[in-house]
Amino acid sequence: MENTQVIDWDAEEEEETEISSGSLGYSVEPIGRLRFFSGTHGPERDFPLYLGKNVVGRSPDCSVALPFPSISKQHAVIEISAWNKAPILQDCGSLNGTQIVKPPRVLAPGVSHRLRDQELILFADFPCQYHRLNVPPPLVPRSLLTIEKTPRIRGRSQNSRVLLAEDSEEEGDFPSGRSVANGSRNTASPSATVVPESDEEGSSPGPSVPGPSSPFGLGSDTDESQGQQPGVEESSLADNSGAAGEPEQPEVNGVTTGTLAQPTKDKFKDTKMKEEAGSAGVPVGSVVEGSPTLGEDSDTEADEERQPSGSGDSDTDVEEERVPVKKNQVLLGVGIGGPGARGVAHLQDSPTGSDTDVEEDKTALAAPPERSHTAMVINSDTDEEERGEEEEVSAALTLARLKERGIALWSGEPGTEEVKSQPQVLVERSQSASGRDSDTDVEEGSSGGKREIVPDSPMDVDETLTVTQPESQPPCRPNDVDEDVDMSSPGSHLEGKKASSALVDKNRAQVEEEVPGPSVTLGEKHQVPLEGAQPPEEARETAVQEGSSSPVADIRMSQQPVAEDAGTECAAAVSEQKSALEVGAQSRSPAAPVEQVVVRTDTSGDPTLPQREGAQTPTGREREAHVGGTKHAKECCDEPEDLCLSATQCFVEGESQHPGAVQSLEDEPTQVFPCLPQEPGPSHLSLPTPGADTLDVPWEVLATQPFCLREQTETSEPIDTHEAHGSQPSLPGEPPGHQHPVPTSLDHTELLRIDDREMQTVEKAMGHLSCQMMPDGKASGDDPEPSDHRLFSPVPEASASPQSLLTSQSQKQSTPQPMFPTSSSELALPETLHTKPNVRPRRSSRMTPSPHSSAALKPYTTCPTNQPAASRPTSRPTRGRANRSSTRTPELIVPTGPELQPSTSTEQPGIPNLTSQVTEGRAHSTSVNMPEPVLTGPEAQPLTSAEQSVTSNLNPRAQPLTLEPVPQTSHQRRRRATGKQGSRTAPVGPKSYSTPAEPEPQSSASQSSGASEADSPHQKRPRRQVTQKTVVVKEEDPGEIQVKEEPQETAIPTPGKRKRDPAEGETQGNPTRSRRTKPNQEAAAPKVLFTGVVDSRGERAVLALGGSLASSVNEASHLVTDRIRRTVKFLCAVGKGIPILSLNWLYQSRKAGCFLPPDDYLVTDPEQEKNFSFSLRDSLSRARERRLLEDYEIHVTPGVQPPPPQMGEIISCCGGTVLPSMPHSYKLHRVVITCTEDLPRCAIASRLGLPLLSPEFLLTGVLKQEATPEAFVLSNLEM
């Protein structure tokens, strides 16, 4: 392997370039270019155009950024759907218009025009010419890992348009941008998406990797891509790609970290990513998905091609591709036995089919999963280098994963499917993994349990996959042998790549395991460092923490999950999810995120293999989507992916379960089966690190959350019920202690992915991830395994957002097998939740605002409660996903079952809660479509106990879990019912959580937020769908929001559902906020009016969040513009005192999944405020206190500009009375507004002594909210 991974950096860089064009076909290569002719604005300049949406505008986010006043912020869009198709030019409602020169034609906004080669275009006054570049069709042959192309959603491709601009140039700098760019390119040919060889992948241009990778890396393991989104995208890449690319350390702690095999440039990014990924062991899956996003040039390209949706732009594509991929499930097996327990992350191509294999592999300690973990390790080891490499690896892995997932989806045979998909992924990963022979790296990280593998060389990327193999477990990987082979020898790995199909056949699970494994394992190892209790894992966690400061934070989170084994996993997931959330827009790739990481911890304490399942890829997508969302709110293509996502749910599976059982679960294509052995003291500390990262995403998450809340609320009740039923029945069936933990992990993982993401966001927002993590640590002490689960869960959660639904479905399907590892996992989650309080408030408020969000998020939140720190962040994104996806994915029952079971488990209750939560979040989402009482019971039970324990004490978490699982189940139901009425507080009381209510609420908020945010990225797509459907309505009713939120909370309280717990916490501590925000948001159901800007992306965000577009100022509740301008609408808004907000408010709200509080997004225009000597904030404040012209009667003469009707509108909005005719009597405060031309008309008024004022009395007076007629009297000279 090492030989294979040996990378000649110089050569690789060239290779990278080659690969970007060749391997990916079109991923990195520009499809065309815009040549702007020289003129007064400057010299001639060329802008490359990539697949997807290329936005032309003044905004620096635009692909074609023209920083000139005549160009609108988003002037026009050139969408390239495929390399061989003519680009579509659309004007975005620009101020100065877009014209075709020959024949002369002005493009009306929204009208499409097919560009011909050499066609001349006029953007405002900037002439340019479109040139088509001869780009060879995507090389499908190169992608042994070609994924069955999932329906690529053009919307996604569009989503990436804004990001695209950054992609090529800002790839490194702007992960999200890069992601998008890659994505857009990828979108062009989903089927063409090829997983470049690891070296080549590594070689891919670094820029490609950093941007997208980084954003997606943030997401949790499940949402590897998602995790990668923010900045952890890199990390995710590191996980996925990193796992593949970084030199794998043979099995550190049974988890080998694959160093990114990516080329130098990528390596640099990968390293960075690795750091992030390191913390996001889970992110491996994400990496795979997000990997393209991560944009390792070669990897990313390959990945991108592989998973166009995976990329921010291609989010859609990746997600679509991921949809098939979603079948891939990652089971994160976290060995509870030892901190360094060789948790192996398995990327299961087909959660359903391969799960069994994966589980078996897990049972065997599947080395490949650990290898996957290795990828994570890579992350933490070398911050910069690893990150870069990780990004690359992540990209490669993501691609591979997507492909393998796609294959899994397409393949009918569960085991075979997984193998099949895996081989592709493996190939990609193998390329990465073998290239990275990071086994050593992984071992390095693994040995410490930290798995902070420093991906020394980009070649490590290839090895990443290989690395997955745990040191102790390598032998255990018979199925993984192929993967082992891949990882064992570079040649083998490459061979595996080439023979990926063979590998797949051998053991799709195995391959899957390997692919996802790196991420998870890495996370575990890396995260371990964070936690003191589990040295190896702590080390890993530490690495994660390192990463956490930057995108690594997310990665770290991902990593953490692995490191904590239980706690760390959560944390990692959180960070990843956070990332995903951040990448909210890009998070659109819900489908891709389907890939989930299943945390599997053996009760025996044997290293379990975390297996990344289909959810993870979705996570990556989510991440990407999120990024896209962040970069481009317009990337609404998420919705389609959401749909895909629903298909890609994770199944929760108990480790005790037989491989057969797993398989059956796996049969549900996108289901993740988390198997968590109880491992003491997962490094919860790692969670805090993710928290910090998470804090970055909180607002976005918050914004996304409201929707999640509503939707979740909606789904929450049914799901809760399901959970109760399914979970409870399952509970008895399985050994409470043993099985609960496993399912918990699963559910937890899945939900965590959802919740964690959300949590991440929240935590990011709160900057409290660290706290979360700490509580997690406590939980870890109590329920180490739960912690681990949590961590892993978060990873799944990251994927969960889309996968949340998926998970729900999966769980629904797998309801019968709720062993409820969830209970363990959930237990951990509550702890996390606890830690996450700080994060929670912000997130919570955001999240609560949207009932939909509350419902969906709550379930997710529940997960976070258990895994607040890690889970929550993941939960957020995941939740968002689930939320959006929830409408279409009614298969939450499965999660329900497991959730319930977790409650049974005493120690694992926390975890079960987590799982439950995750499940519930998903279930909730799904609930809308398919309410099943099963979930509710169990969920409520485990959640409450877990949540309470977590809340009151992370340590007690285990015990509360036991206690409250059943009561909570009913309680949750009850709460949901009552909570809906507004007893969010009530949930607080019932839960021991009440004490940590604040933290937990925060956590819950975080989760909700995260879910929302994840939703926004992931949820963005799903949310668009789900939120639009469910959320919108729910969001509309503040009461309902509260109620729904309560239900979510109720759901969250259920012990079975950690997610719910966080939601509950949110409702408890943050409930008021949530409630407050939601009611405002909902009550107001914002009616948004735009002035001076035409922003279809913003309009879509409004609609997706449940608001409406106002036709006039009179019915508007919010005015959106880009600067202070004295337009009639603007002045009317000032006169009425309605918030005048920047476009960023909509973008961030979209990411957060709900309308964020407007106060932070008031338009800022220091120049204009200085010119007119006023403060907009003060003016609005005065206008709200008292109308400026309340006592005034004003007549406006005909010659005044603006014309009298518009002046009359301004006067009315300021409380004045308009006199239709010239007044004939004097009265105080009766004035005439006129101009010099109309002075003759004013003779009577002048004789009466009525003040004759210039229009500035209104225009300036309204702006400053000062009525000073004497200052604007027309002088006698003028008269």
Curated annotation (Swiss-Prot):
Modification Phosphothreonine occurs at: 4, 146, 222, 300, 316, 356, 382, 440, 466, 889, 951, 1054
A GO CC term assigned to this protein in UniProt: nucleus
Disulfide bonds: none
Annotated GO MF terms: chromatin-protein adaptor activity; histone reader activity
Compositional bias of kind Basic and acidic residues: 264-277, 620-634, 1032-1047
Keyword match DNA repair: yes
Cross-link (Glycyl lysine isopeptide (Lys-Gly) (interchain with G-Cter in SUMO2)): 991, 1034
Modified residue annotations for N6-acetyllysine: 764
SMART domains on file: BRCT, FHA
Predominant location: nucleus
Keywords: Acetylation, Cell cycle, Chromosome, DNA damage, DNA repair, Isopeptide bond, Nucleus, Phosphoprotein, Repeat, Ubl conjugation
Subcellular location: Nucleus; Chromosome
PTM statement from Swiss-Prot or TrEMBL: Phosphorylated upon exposure to ionizing radiation (IR), ultraviolet radiation (UV), and hydroxyurea (HU). Phosphorylation in response to IR requires ATM, NBN, and possibly CHEK2. Also phosphorylated during the G2/M phase of the cell cycle and during activation of the mitotic spindle checkpoint. Phosphorylation at Thr-4 by ATM stabilizes and enhances homodimerization via the FHA domain. Phosphorylated at Ser-168 and Ser-198 by CK2 in response to DNA damage during mitosis, promoting interaction with TOPBP1.
PROSITE patterns: BRCT, FHA_DOMAIN
Modification Phosphoserine, positions: 168, 176, 198, 220, 298, 314, 350, 354, 372, 380, 394, 411, 421, 434, 438, 457, 488-489, 550, 587, 589, 730, 745, 793, 801, 824, 1008-1009, 1012, 1016
InterPro entries: BRCT_dom, BRCT_dom_sf, DDR_Transcriptional_Reg, FHA_dom, SMAD_FHA_dom_sf
Region (Interaction with CHEK2): 1-150
Free-text note on domains in this protein's UniProt record: Tandemly repeated BRCT domains are characteristic of proteins involved in DNA damage signaling. In MDC1, these repeats are required for localization to chromatin which flanks sites of DNA damage marked by 'Ser-139' phosphorylation of H2AX.
Quaternary organization: Homodimer. Interacts with H2AX, which requires phosphorylation of H2AX on 'Ser-139'. Interacts with the MRN complex, composed of MRE11, RAD50, and NBN. Interacts with CHEK2, which requires ATM-mediated phosphorylation of 'Thr-68' within the FHA domain of CHEK2. Interacts constitutively with the BRCA1-BARD1 complex, SMC1A and TP53BP1. Interacts with ATM and FANCD2, and these interactions are reduced upon DNA damage. Also interacts with the PRKDC complex, composed of XRCC6/KU70, XRCC5/KU80 and PRKDC/XRCC7.
Protein name as catalogued: Mediator of DNA damage checkpoint protein 1
Species assigned in the record: Rattus norvegicus
Lineage of source species: Eukaryota, Metazoa, Chordata, Craniata, Vertebrata
Chain's gene name: Mdc1
